[in-house]
Amino acid sequence: MKRISFYLLNFFLLQSVAVELMADIDESDVLQAMAKPGRLLADINRDNRSRPEAISPLQNLELGDSVVDIFAGGGYYSELLASVVGDQGEVFLHNSPGFESWGRNGLYDRFASDRNPGKITRHTQSGINLSLNSESLDGALIVMAIHDLYVIPKRYNGEEYVAVGNSANTGYFLDQVFASLKPGGRFVIVHHQGNPESSIEVITDLHRIDETFVRSEVEAHGFVFVDSSNALRTESDDRDRIVFDEDIQGKTDRFVIAFEKPIN
């Protein structure tokens, strides 16, 4: 009888661990990660304007999951994600060389020898190449960078900025994200809201893009829209202004939308 009780106890303990591993990461988990000692001061100062506790739950992640933070720059979200998925999971901090350079100060501080940012794999690839294994990820995130896929590269000729090339192959990029996700995996996009039907020129100049346009582009590549958040909405934002204007920087109207790779 004692042996049976011992086996039953072990069974229920294992079941309890399994349930814990399968529990969705929610707002309280993200808030706990945000409250951890040793976070970078720059990250703490960003928390109020980025509201990760309202964004990350849309990813529908679980402890032990693998996720990619696309064009992550200095890795603000990467470290938070590493904290919530735990050492059983993995976070890919993905950058192109340009985004790597833009985020170099944050990356230097984040990966300093005297701190542990969690289980993060730095993943720098050329251009819009993601180079991720097929159906290897439970989630993907891109924050304030989706518009860069549409940007027309320009160069100053001494009088004005003139186009020197074409925008990226957005379809190729989205197909890569789709292929990297497991069925049921989510792709979350956060960006500055632009005016409807904005031209590529306006998207390039203002660093804004329309939510409806982005949604139609993503859905055209197999994703299904599943959720959104109004946590970063600001109706008073002037969408005709560049997002870097000092008095609106960090306070723009931002959309948050979540897509899923269909299971069947």
Task: Explain the meaning of each model-derived region.
Residues 64, 87-88, 181-187:
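Short glycine-dipeptide loop
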Residues 64-73:
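Conserved class I S-adenosyl-L-methionine
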Residues 75-79:
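Glycine-rich SAM-binding Motif I of class I
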Residues 30-62:
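Class I SAM-dependent methyltransferase Rossmann-like catalytic core
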Residues 131-140, 144:
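A short acidic, Gly/Pro-enriched loop at the edge of an enzyme's catalytic core
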Residues 103-130:
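S-adenosyl-L-methionine
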Residues 221, 238-264:
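Core SAM-dependent methyltransferase catalytic element
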Residues 82-83, 156-183:
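A short glycine-rich, Lys/Arg-flanked "PGG" loop and its adjoining helix->strand segment in the class I
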